[in-house]
Amino acid sequence: MSQQVIIFDTTLRDGEQALQASLSVKEKLQIALALERMGVDVMEVGFPVSSPGDFESVQTIARQIKNSRVCGLARCVEKDIDAAYEALRVADAYRIHTFLATSPMHIATKLRSTLPEVIERAVKMIRRARNYTDDVEFSCEDGGRTPIDDLCRVVEAAINAGATTINIPDTVGYTLPYEYANIFSALRARVPNIDKAILSVHTHDDLGMAVGNALAAVNAGARQIEGAMNGLGERAGNCALEETIMAIKTRGQLMNVHTRINHQEIYRTCQTVSKICNMPIPAHKAIIGSNAFAHSSGIHQDGVLKNRENYEILTPESIGLKQVQLNLTSRSGRAAVKHRMEEMGYGETEYNMDRLYDAFKALADKKGQVFDYDLEALAFINQQSEEPEYFRLDTFNVQSGSSVIATATVQLRCGDEQKTEAATGNGPVDAVYQAINRLTEFDAELVSYQLTAKGHGKDALGQVDIVVQYNGRKFHGVGLATDIVESSAKAMVNALNTIWRARQVEQELQRKSQVKDQKETV
C-alpha cells in the first residue's frame, strides 16, 4: 500500500532568508493561506525568539491556519523553546522544531563543545519542548557531514527524549543522492527505536542536488520532505517543493509513496510566493517556468499536436495552469469579473471586489481588453494595498528627452494634506523619485529596481518592484500601470507607506515600553 510523504514547507522561515527585504505580517499571512489551500501538512512560519516582528507573524498565522500544522523554529535554548510555545499555543495544531549541530566541524568550531555535551543539551531541550506539545521535531544540523556512528547516537537519544520527527539536513548541499540515501538506510538499520519517529529530509541546492537528494532519501525510507516553494532559501536555495511534489505525483509508484497536496494549487501558490517575495520565476524553471510547457522544435510541435504525451510527462492543467484565457472589456459587469475570478481560483475573501472592479474598469478603459494575467496582477496589487495609506499619489507630470534634463512634478496626499513638489533627475523615474522624497522627507535610498511585463504587446501592464533602504532596514514596494513611470511612482509610494506603518508600530512599542517602565518605577 502506498505510504504518505509529509510535506513540510519552510518558505516563510528558511525561504525568507534569501530575500532582500523582510516580509510584513500581512504578506506572510497571504503566503501561509496559499500554502494551506495547497494542502501542505506542516508549515514552518518563523523563528519566534529572533524578533518581536517574527513572534507576531508566527502568532498571527497560528491563529488563522486551520487545516495545516503550524511550526516554529527554536535553538536548543530554553528561551527559544518557551518563545516558540508562546507564539504557537493559539494554533489548532502546532509543532516545535528545535535543532543543534552534530558534525565534528560545527561542534568544534561553532559550538566549541563535544558530542556528549551536544547529546545532553539536545535531550534536555527536547524534553522541555515535549512539556508543551507531543509534536516535537529535532534537526541534526549539518547531518550530511556527521559521521554515521555519531549520527546514530544523537538520533537514538533524541527519540528517547521524545522527538517524534528526526530531520537530517544536508545543510550545505554537500552530499550526492546515493550518499544521502545511505544515511537514511543506515539510521533505519542501526537505530533501535527508529520506528518511533518519522525520518525527515532537508536539502540545499549548492551543487544542484536538492530535489534529487530528497527523492533518494524518500526511496530509502524518509517520510517527510522539507523545502520551499520556488526553491527559495539560503545561498543556492532549498529543495523546490513544487518539483518534488510533482516528481512524486508522476513517478511515486516506483517508490510506493504519495502526498496529500492539492496539485491544482501549485502554479497559483508559486506565483503568489514569487510576487510577494519579489523573486521572479526563471522562464526555464521546471514545472512552473513560462517555458515549462513550450515546444519550439518542429519535430516536438508535430509530436505534441498528434499526442501531447509524446513530449509532455505532465499537463499544465495538473498544476492549475489554465490554457484557455478569456478576455473582458469595459462593458463587462461586476458579475462577469467576479465569475472569472472564481474560475481562476480566487475566493471572495481574498480580494476587495469594489476596489478590484474600479481598477478593472480603469484598466479596461486604457487598453480595451483585460486578460486573465491582468486580473491576477490587479488582484495581487489589490491585496498589497489593503493597509491604511498615509501617502497617496494624486497626479504626476514628467518632461524628458535626449536634449533636456528630466523634470517631474508630483502631487502627493500626505494624510489629510495635499502637497506638490518638482525635481530634476537622471531620467523621468529618478526625477519622480527625487520629488517624492522631498515631499515625504524620508530620503529612502533605492537599492534595487525591477520591471516585469504582465502580459503581451504594447499595452501590457508593467509591474515595478523596488527595494529601498531607510534607517538601515530594507522595504519592498510594488506598483502596476500601463505606463512604467506611473508604476514606478506607485511602487515608491507603496514602499514609503510600508516605512510609515513600520514607524507607527515602532512608536507604539516605545510608548508601551515607557508606560511599563513608569508602572514598574511606581
From Swiss-Prot:
Keywords: Amino-acid biosynthesis, Branched-chain amino acid biosynthesis, Cytoplasm, Leucine biosynthesis, Manganese, Metal-binding, Transferase. Its EC number is 2.3.3.13. GO terms for biological process: L-leucine biosynthetic process. One of its GO terms (molecular function) is 2-isopropylmalate synthase activity. It is found in: Cytoplasm. PROSITE patterns: AIPM_HOMOCIT_SYNTH_1 (PS00815), AIPM_HOMOCIT_SYNTH_2 (PS00816), PYR_CT (PS50991). Residues 392-522 are annotated as: Regulatory domain. Residues 5-267 form the Pyruvate carboxyltransferase domain. Pathway: Amino-acid biosynthesis; L-leucine biosynthesis; L-leucine from 3-methyl-2-oxobutanoate: step 1/4. Catalyzes the condensation of the acetyl group of acetyl-CoA with 3-methyl-2-oxobutanoate (2-ketoisovalerate) to form 3-carboxy-3-hydroxy-4-methylpentanoate (2-isopropylmalate). Belongs to the alpha-IPM synthase/homocitrate synthase family. LeuA type 1 subfamily. HAMAP family: LeuA_type1. This is 2-isopropylmalate synthase. It comes from Erwinia tasmaniensis (strain DSM 17950 / CFBP 7177 / CIP 109463 / NCPPB 4357 / Et1/99).
